[in-house]
Amino acid sequence: MTLLSALSPALAAADLAGPARRGQAIAWVMAGLSVAFDASCEEIWLAFAHGACLVPAPRSLVRSGVDVGPWLTANQVSIVSTVPTLVALWPPAALDRVRLLILGGEAFPPELVTRLQAPGREVWNTYGPTEATVVACAAMVTGELPVRIGLPLAGWDLAVVDGEGRPVGIGESGELIIGGVGLARYLDPAKDAEKYAPMPTLGWKRAY
């Protein structure tokens, strides 16, 4: 439920639930990330949660450049979630049919902003380490620089703190702290308590 709620802003903004032809999927989502990469959950559940068609892509094809365009067109792919490094390898024409492009996993290079924007397409920059269930915040890319990671999504909290855990002022540097419903936990309560300790200065019971 955490991941689905995290995807909601981008999905709603892209109007994926618009008119659909009877008997046809409303959208086609590329599944191009390795399942060993946590961001693959974004592709899978994005499609399943909204009745879209999930289209697996061969890993060798995703890593290539010119071969991606014809594959995306042939498979009617309209939604792509990937990392900037990969999308930078693809020719602009490869994304002609894509109306929702979600990027994350690494910094968004400024030089990609103009190249990826197109009429009828929304581009989102997302941030969230594996420890925070893939996505904790997101921002629509508008062309304004620098490219931002956005505000926390529903159920999440973000804060930038100093060395003593106190929130810093606007324009000041500090460490980004994440709190919220999707922080990881597993079979070792002691290790969980160590890695996701409380942040009393923020009033958070768990933080990363």
Briefly describe each language-model feature range.
Residues 23-25, 31, 41, 94-97, ...:
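His-Asp-centered acyl/peptidyl-transfer active-site segments
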